[in-house]
């Protein structure tokens, strides 16, 4: 198996790059996260996954970031998730956020990702939870009622559960808040910065 390739980027098109490695030109499929970090003529090292299938030519998947590579491999452990679907999922969110969604059992947030419906999201949680449970987002005990109300308000505004929990936790770590309204307002500022 090819664990990685090193060479010069000669073309970027959609989610595919062409990399010149010695005398070879390799077409490598990448997530949007990896594509954003690449530029033409740049010399790069990509971690790779080689996929074989009876009904199509071999495909190489490339990752600039080890965390994304590891989450890609983790996704392949789930039933009915192939490399193309795993790449599509990783193109829609960060590896860290995906792990937090699975660990927090955020079915709603997961099912909003492209290609994932409610059943697939539930399957991901049931099959991969043990691998990511340390990433679960929890609230400090003393403010859990206010925090839960704030998360409820943020999800009603259209934010996914995991993003809402992360924003609320960040606010609570940085400063004290008087009530739910103040917490929602400050969390909204954080969420709007990341959009």
UniProtKB/Swiss-Prot annotation:
Residues 137-141 are annotated as: Flexible linker. This is Holliday junction branch migration complex subunit RuvA. Residues 142-195 are annotated as: Domain III. GO terms for molecular function: ATP binding; four-way junction DNA binding; four-way junction helicase activity. It is found in: Cytoplasm. Has three domains with a flexible linker between the domains II and III and assumes an 'L' shape. Domain III is highly mobile and contacts RuvB. Pfam families: HHH_5, RuvA_C, RuvA_N. Homotetramer. Forms an RuvA(8)-RuvB(12)-Holliday junction (HJ) complex. HJ DNA is sandwiched between 2 RuvA tetramers; dsDNA enters through RuvA and exits via RuvB. An RuvB hexamer assembles on each DNA strand where it exits the tetramer. Each RuvB hexamer is contacted by two RuvA subunits (via domain III) on 2 adjacent RuvB subunits; this complex drives branch migration. In the full resolvosome a probable DNA-RuvA(4)-RuvB(12)-RuvC(2) complex forms which resolves the HJ. It comes from Kosmotoga olearia (strain ATCC BAA-1733 / DSM 21960 / TBF 19.5.1). GO terms for biological process: DNA recombination; DNA repair. Residues 65-137 are annotated as: Domain II. The keyword Metal-binding does not apply. It comes from the Bacteria. Residues 1-64 are annotated as: Domain I. Belongs to the RuvA family. The gene is ruvA.
């Amino acid at each position: 198996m090819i664990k990685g390739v090193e060479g010069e980027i000669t073309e970027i098109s959609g989610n595919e790059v062409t990399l010149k490695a010695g005398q070879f030109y390799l077409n490598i499929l990448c997530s949007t996260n990896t594509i954003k970090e690449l530029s033409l003529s740049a010399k790069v090292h990509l971690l790779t996954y080689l996929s074989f299938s009876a009904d199509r030519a071999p495909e190489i998947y490339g990752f600039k970031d080890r965390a994304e590579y590891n989450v890609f491999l983790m996704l392949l452990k789930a039933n009915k998730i192939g490399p193309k679907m795993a790449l599509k999922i990783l193109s829609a969110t960060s590896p860290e956020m995906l792990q937090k969604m699975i660990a927090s059992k955020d079915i709603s947030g997961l099912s909003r990702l492209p290609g994932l419906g409610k059943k697939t999201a539930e399957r991901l949680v049931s099959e991969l939870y043990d691998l990511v449970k340390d990433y679960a987002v929890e609230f400090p005990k003393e403010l859990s009622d206010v925090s839960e109300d704030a998360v409820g308000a943020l999800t009603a505004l259209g934010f996914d559960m995991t993003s809402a929990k992360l924003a609320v936790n960040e606010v609570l770590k940085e400063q004290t808040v008087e009530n739910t309204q103040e917490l929602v307002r400050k969390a909204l500022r954080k969420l709007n910065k990341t959009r």
